[in-house]
Amino acid sequence: MSTSNPPRPPLLKSAFDWAAVWHKNQYRKYPVALVPYMSHVAGVASILSRHGFAEEVVAAGALHDVMEDCGITHDELVKRFGERVADLVRHVSEPDKSLSWEDRKRLYLEHFSTKPWEAQAITLADKIDNLESIVVCAVSHGDPWKMFKRGRDVQITRFEELAERASRLPSHPLIDEYRRALASVVAL
């Protein structure tokens, strides 16, 4: 009998499978449709893949909300997906859910520029998918601003603040895509 470690399952397949398990009872916030949260997971991962990011970054994109929304620990992510994926997920997770929404968002933006590029890319892909969801909601499901506890102006300001911080980064097509997605929402 071999004493070697068992092979690790394919990273992306495993990331999507576990994201589906962990997000199983979660839905997007569309006002009139129950869209499974996996739609967002797939959207974020797809954006990262389309921009040529490494498999570990795409996997972290698929898992980007599991620490803050599902209570999954960094150690659990390390065990299943390795240190790099777990660290990227930690970088994009809000550290203290006991703070107010405003304080969490402010702190996240303040620390955006100190994060590794791959974590910044996951954040941008996450927000691109959120912006695209606002457009889809406006076209197919009704008033998109009903999805948010805070109104349109607060949300737009938050997205614009991220665009300003992203503009300080070296040029990348992902940043350009973020700007286009934001412009589409502002035009609604």
Regions found by a protein language model. Give the residues of each.
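Active-site helical microenvironments for divalent-metal-assisted chemistry
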Residues: 2-188
